[in-house]
Amino acid sequence: MFPVVWRNTARADLRQIITDIAAENPGAARRLKIRLETVVLPLSEHPYLYRTSDRIPGLREIVAHPNYIVLYRVTSSSIEIVNVVHARRQFPI
């Protein structure tokens, strides 16, 4: 079982996404935040659950929402959540 660790870059991405959405729709922002934070939970026991990234070597991708992708890396001791990106605007990073 691996710990899931959010890097500062991923936390900053998440914070910015939620802030932007909350300006227009606070309820949608809360729901998306919950979704993005919970979609990574199975990684602790199943680190290879999601596909390898064709765009960024060494990373894996979770399409957590039609517009948002969570990028993560499996290391020898943990799962690192690296970035959360908008599928159209910020990808590839």
Feature roles, as predicted:
Residues 48-77:
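Basic/aromatic recognition patch in beta-strand/loop cores that engages polyanionic ligands
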Residues 30, 68-69, 73-93:
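Enriched for short, Lys/Arg-rich terminal
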Residues 43, 62, 91:
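Short clusters of hydrophobic/aromatic residues that line enzyme substrate/ligand-binding pockets
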Residues 1-2, 93:
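Absolute protein N-terminus
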Residues 3-59:
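Basic, Lys/Arg-enriched alpha-helical interface segments
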